[in-house]
């Protein structure tokens, strides 16, 4: 339905784009990812726009649709780097699961897919797809729809920034201690204060 599609595009955050998105129809695409079922659905949706190839070496661009930064995902990035192919990372995640600095730095573009319509009443139906639909993802990759989401939490880009983030304030990652303490004092006095970004 239209509302669900709108929610999917409005909850997708374009974290990075090194002038690769939107993709072009003449580009050959290799699709890989965490789930073979998701990859199969993505291939079918992307094939409406471009040629999907079965080998990374034959591709102009790689679409990596993953749910975690695990060994398989890191190996995919290494293989793409060896083949000198740009990666568009489509990362299904949320507050507790986000792309790390390695993933972002290894990608030419990053779409952070935060949409999840999992039932919250303790049960779910088998084979019920509850993430961003492959057709909506393909539309965003090819510029038919625009991702317009924003994060409601911070993401540290370096491990040093992550260590410096105290976790209780937004927008304090990487700021100096004096500014961070000032921000904490402002929020303590007025919890609804707008902090500079």
Which residues are covered by each model-predicted region?
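C-terminal non-catalytic regions of proteins with extracellular/luminal or membrane-system context
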Residues: 2-197
């Amino acid at each position: 339905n239209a509302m669900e599609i709108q929610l999917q595009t409005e909850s997708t955050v374009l974290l990075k784009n090194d002038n690769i998105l939107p993709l072009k129809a003449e580009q050959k695409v290799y699709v890989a990812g965490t789930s073979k079922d998701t990859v199969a659905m993505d291939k079918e949706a992307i094939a409406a726009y471009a040629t999907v190839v079965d080998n990374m070496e034959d591709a102009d661009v790689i679409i990596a649709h993953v749910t975690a930064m695990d060994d398989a995902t890191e190996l995919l990035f290494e293989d793409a780097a060896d083949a000198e192919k740009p990666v568009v990372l489509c990362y299904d995640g949320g507050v507790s699961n986000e792309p790390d600095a390695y993933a972002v730095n290894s990608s030419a573009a990053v779409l952070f897919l935060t949409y999840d319509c999992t039932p919250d009443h303790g049960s779910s139906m088998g084979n019920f797809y509850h993430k961003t639909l492959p057709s909506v993802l393909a539309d965003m990759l090819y510029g038919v729809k625009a991702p317009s989401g924003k994060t409601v939490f911070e993401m540290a880009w370096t491990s040093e920034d992550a260590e410096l983030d105290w976790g209780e304030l937004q927008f304090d990652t990487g700021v100096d201690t004096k500014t961070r303490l000032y921000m904490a004092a402002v929020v303590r006095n007025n919890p609804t204060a707008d902090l500079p970004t």
